[in-house]
Amino acid sequence: MPTATHVATEYGTLRRVAMRHAGDFTRPLTGPDVHPVLARQRATSTWTSYDPAAVRAQQDQLIGLLRDRGAEVVLLSAAPDCSAQHYPRDIAVSVDHVLFRARLNSQHRLPETDALSDPTLGLRPVDLTRGTIEGGDVMLPDTSRVLVGLSEETSPDGAAALQEALARHGVDREVVPVHFKVEGIVHLDDHLAVVAPGTALIHREVFTTDQNRWFDAHFDDLIPVTEAEARAVQVNVLAIAPTTTVVAAGSDRITTILAAHGLEVLTVDYGEVTRIPGSLRCTTLPLLRT
């Protein structure tokens, strides 16, 4: 029997999560052969070379923390020649009882999704029909909506395909496209993080005026972050329970604010991971939250 997949919100207690260690293969971040999407993304985020062994060591710190907190950590098999394989958040999204396989925007990342079909994992990923959509752009702020950021990696067609697939599988949720006012956005989760019921970190400057109004109307407490904090990927936190959030070491102001909101804040050194724009949320793919 397949293991249950169920994720209702961003902040349910984390019980089962997939991760994948960084591989030794890396891609050039500068030069004439850099993809135009990456060139645009460099305007809104910081990209520097990283040491894969150091990334793996920092991932092991997070794995230990999650296991100590009662989560089962499933390690996905390697994806050869995939420099971003340690960001499994992008390859799928769990919405309620269904795991949807992402439609990745970059050709070189496509092999990353193969691990979802490993029979030992007990997963039954559902394919979407069109467009592009990556898990870093998909958020579950509550039990009735799915936010989908229209970043460089996710298209309106991808968001529409998710809405159609939800209906086919009996998931009664509204897909809400999230609009940015600038090009070059890597993913929504570098600029918005739902950390508790009705509470989110937000980098307001990248969203349209209408989008900010929508956030104001649908969240009880929006905590603004600075441009520097967003560039340092400090928004990309991981809620592991309704009152517990993991943040990257060095996110001092954010840590203080979250603690003042009554949250337990745990820290992990992720300084090597964040040398390209991904952090705690990016390196985890929740499969079961309660």
Placement of each model-derived feature along the sequence:
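The feature marks the mature, well-folded catalytic cores of soluble enzymes
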Residues: 1-290
